[in-house]
């Protein structure tokens, strides 16, 4: 599913972030990191830029479910991912591409986030932002080196904040 980059006022994004963290039972540490630290830094150091909230759920590398969150370049300010309550390892991969996931060779992979325990969660904040030149495709595989898709039910849920 392709989602065009559509930036909006920061307050709307922060409302969505707050709702998502509560609905996914994010830990208090992640809530504080996003809702205080990142929000304050963007407001004071980046001039409160227009942002976009992008959610993903049950990520696999199936072409139907890989969310292409931006078909043009963008800057990622934050990622939150929470693994479903399964024993199967999931490696969330953030790819710098408008159309392709990393695959076995990982040519497009910029970030690999291991989610190895049921309900594992990770919050990552990028200051001054992680620049993605061509777009972002989110994928999940069973190993860090890649190639084997995460199956439905094992993939992580979460969101990104981009600008």
Residue ranges and their predicted role:
Residues 77-79, 129-147:
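Noncatalytic modules at the cell exterior or secretory-pathway interfaces
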């Amino acid at each position: 599913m392709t989602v065009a980059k559509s930036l909006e006022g920061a307050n709307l994004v922060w409302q969505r972030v707050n709702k998502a963290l509560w609905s996914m039972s994010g830990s208090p540490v992640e809530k504080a990191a996003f809702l205080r630290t990142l929000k304050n830094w963007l407001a004071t150091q980046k001039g409160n830029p227009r942002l976009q909230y992008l959610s993903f759920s049950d990520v696999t590398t199936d072409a139907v479910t890989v969310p292409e969150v931006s078909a043009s370049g963008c800057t990622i300010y934050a990622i939150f991912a929470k693994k479903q309550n399964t024993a199967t390892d999931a490696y969330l991969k953030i790819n710098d591409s408008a159309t392709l996931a990393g695959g076995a060779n990982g040519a497009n992979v910029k970030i690999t986030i291991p989610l190895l325990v049921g309900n594992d969660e990770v919050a990552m904040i990028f200051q001054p932002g992680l620049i993605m030149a061509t777009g972002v495709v989110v994928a999940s595989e069973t190993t860090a080196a890649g190639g084997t898709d995460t199956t439905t039910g094992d993939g992580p849920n979460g969101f990104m904040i981009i600008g």
